[in-house]
Amino acid sequence: HKEYIGVDSCAVNLMRPAMYGAYHHITVLGKEDAPCDHKYDVTGSLCENNDKFAIDRYLPKVDMGDLLVIHDTGAHGFAMGYNYNGKLKSSEILLHEDGSFEMIRRAETPKDYFATFDCFPIYEKLLEDME
């Protein structure tokens, strides 16, 4: 059998692993020094079989509610992103070498998603429905 970790993120946020198997280091927040003795596939939330961040990756035991950090996504994470299946892009967090972090891009909102509809009569109705 195989164990899977399903995360809130998906290929919308980081397409490289799904597209061509790019490796990104993954840690479990607060368990950085724990032994990596459990093998998992780390999967995204899209309904596509290639929406995976890692296959057969050894990580510490992961429990419901744990936060996973996918490292070294760089500029390509956002630049290669897309709004497949209506998924909105997540915020981006910069992890500094000293362990501190900061948000460098906010999460998309439904208003962002529909922004290019502003030239159509339905746009005002969409905005009303979002409020």
Per-range role (PLM):
Residues 1-131:
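Charged (often Lys/Glu-rich) extended helix/loop segments that serve as interaction or gating elements
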